Every structure is written in C-alpha cells, then in structure tokens.
Design a protein with these regions (language model features):
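Short cysteine-rich loop/turn motifs with clustered Cys
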Residues: 31-76, 99
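Catalytic cores of phosphodiester-bond-cleaving enzymes
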Residues: 13-21, 40, 46, 103-119
Length: 119
C-alpha cells in the first residue's frame, strides 16, 4: 500500500528540483522500488533478537517487514544515504532501511543528520 501524497509536478532538469518532487521511498526518478530491491534493502537492517519479521534501522528504531511504505509504529522506507539532490544514486550501497519518521526527519541532511526515533 502506497502513501498518498499530493505532490506538485516540477518539470525541470535540475537534479535538486527533481529530488524535491519525489515521494518518500522512491527511486531517483520517482518510481517505486521493485520487490527485489526492497528485499535487498530489508536484508541490510539489523536483526531484532528472537523476531524474524522485525529488525532495527540505523538509528535503532524497530521496523517490520510488512510495514514497508506505511506510516505506522513499525513502518519503514528506503532511504538514499547520500540524498538524490546531492548526487546520490539508486545503487544498493547507497540505500538503507529507515523507520519512516527517521527518513522524513533526515530529509536532505547529509552527512550530518540526527535520528528522530530510536528504540
């Protein structure tokens, strides 16, 4: 299930403008990530002891596999470590799972950003 957002379409070749018009957890071009990429990014999360469906993001926040793309207690998104607006790519090395609140809080901040939600 996809989050519903109203986004103003920006027709520009400027990378920063394109990045700002993207929905959270989308590719550099604003497309949804394919299932294989979602699974590969999920595999990068830190295991949660005793639970196979829950893991932890880079901030230590608990995320749930089935809550991908949801704004729930354990919802998560795919984050571009180096933001698209700063030259980040869709390469797996530049992607990480983040609790949706941490991803929104991080925004375009890089390299200095802080976690909003922890354990």
């Amino acid at each position: 299930m996809r989050l519903t957002w109203e986004v103003e379409t920006i027709l520009s070749t400027n990378a920063e403008d394109v990045a700002l018009s993207r929905l959270p957890s989308t590719t550099c071009t604003g497309e949804q990530f394919i299932a294989r990429t979602i699974e590969q990014v999920w595999a990068k999360a830190k295991p949660e002891l005793w639970f196979i469906y829950f893991k932890r993001d880079a901030c230590g926040a608990t995320i749930k596999r089935d809550d991908y793309g949801k704004s729930t207690e354990f919802g998560w998104e795919i984050d571009h470590i180096v933001p698209v607006s700063k030259g980040g790519t869709d390469e797996l090395e530049n992607l990480q799972p983040l609790h949706w609140e941490n991803n929104r809080h991080k925004g375009e901040d890089f390299p200095d950003w802080t976690c909003k939600k922890r354990r």
